[in-house]
Swiss-Prot record:
BP GO terms, sorted: protein import into mitochondrial matrix
Protein name: Mitochondrial import receptor subunit TOM40B
Molecular function (Gene Ontology), one example: protein transmembrane transporter activity
Location in or out of the cell: Mitochondrion outer membrane
Entry function: Potential channel-forming protein implicated in import of protein precursors into mitochondria.
Region annotation (Disordered) ranges: 1-29
Membrane association type: Multi-pass membrane protein
Encoding gene per record: TOMM40L
Keywords, comma-separated and alphabetical: Membrane, Mitochondrion, Mitochondrion outer membrane, Protein transport, Transmembrane, Transmembrane beta strand, Transport
Subunit annotation: Forms part of the preprotein translocase of the outer mitochondrial membrane (TOM complex) containing TOMM22, TOMM40, TOMM40L and TOMM70. Interacts with mitochondrial targeting sequences.
Keyword Transport: yes
Predominant location category: mitochondrion
CDD domains named in the record: Porin3_Tom40 (cd07305)
């Protein structure tokens, strides 16, 4: 007879495998929610500063800083840092020990430990000569799509005073992160708590972040126009101080000239800018900054040299 078509039974037809969704990313730390926007703004500069960095080994480095200013006496700082062998990312190495001591004997120290694959611990100490000012202990757990942190600040069992801070962040989508912060403080005759809600939305070229609570609000917007230009906008309102500030920051990178420019304008009539210039092949970076507050009629400028 004629040709016949061999048809496969319905059950034998190939099926499309279900599309696997990518797992949600970890939202990171609560303290880093506004980091991208803050990195756009220039740091305050005043006086003359010389910084000499020296790498002693793959694990240990030191830095010497001399600062001279018209607002105070000259100062010297010795900075030392130790980094271990366990590197989780280009910016995360465990254990890490960092210390900074000035000419008056005051010390700022920080210790970072990786207790388990997802559990991290941090201890911070600050002294003024022979007196302890601050001691703080942090524990952070990073899940697949969430981060939980608990902080104890200045715990004093005898004086019955303590500051407890709890953070939680959850990735709802690849772009949206929601969470909150609870700050509890207690000392003799006083006790209170402040709750703050937080949200962050990340697009391809911009990031918007908002913190709202009984203590005030903090909103930031970061936009990367291209490889050279970044801008940031910040809004901060403090209900206790009855103060509101609006700031605009500008970041310009000129790779061919080895220069970086940062500028700011805020609602307090303050204008400032910092220009950094690298001097290859020498390991030297020059920085020049100036800030003017029109409302208070204050002007200060600074110059720094970083070697290494």
């Amino acid at each position: 007879m004629g040709n016949t078509l061999g048809l496969a039974p319905m059950g034998a037809l190939p099926r499309r495998s279900p599309r696997r969704e990518e797992p949600l990313p970890n939202p990171g730390s609560f303290d880093e929610l506004h980091r991208l926007c803050k990195d756009v703004f220039p740091a305050q500069m005043e006086g003359v500063k010389l910084v000499v960095n020296k790498v002693l080994s793959s694990h240990f480095q030191v830095a010497h800083t001399v600062h001279m200013s018209a607002l105070g006496l000259p100062g010297y700082h010795l900075h030392a840092a130790y980094a271990g062998d366990w590197q989780l990312s280009p910016t995360e190495v465990f254990p890490t020990v960092v210390g900074d001591m000035d000419s008056g004997g005051s010390l700022n120290a920080q210790v970072l430990l990786l207790l388990a694959e997802r559990l991290r611990a941090k201890a911070v100490f600050q002294t003024q000569q022979a007196k302890f000012l601050t001691w703080q202990f942090d524990g952070e757990y990073r899940g697949d799509d969430y981060t939980a942190t608990l902080t104890l600040g200045n715990p004093d069992l005898i004086g019955e005073s303590v500051i407890v801070v709890a953070h939680f962040l959850q990735s709802l989508t690849h772009r949206l992160v929601l969470g909150g912060e609870l700050v509890y403080h207690r000392r003799p005759g006083e006790e209170g708590a402040i709750l703050t809600l937080a949200g962050k939305y990340s697009a391809v070229h911009w990031v918007a972040t908002l913190n709202v609570g009984s203590g005030g609000a903090h909103a930031s917007y970061y936009h990367r126009a291209n490889e050279q230009v970044q801008v940031g906008v910040e809004f901060e309102a403090n209900t206790r101080l009855q103060d509101t500030t609006f700031s605009f920051g500008y970041h310009l990178t000129l790779p061919q000239a080895n220069m970086v420019f940062r500028g700011l304008v805020d609602s307090n009539w303050c204008v400032g800018a910092v220009l950094e210039k690298k001097m290859p092949p020498l390991p030297v970076t020059l920085a020049l900054g100036a800030f003017l507050n029109h409302w208070r009629n204050r002007f200060h400028c600074g110059f720094s040299i970083t070697v290494g």
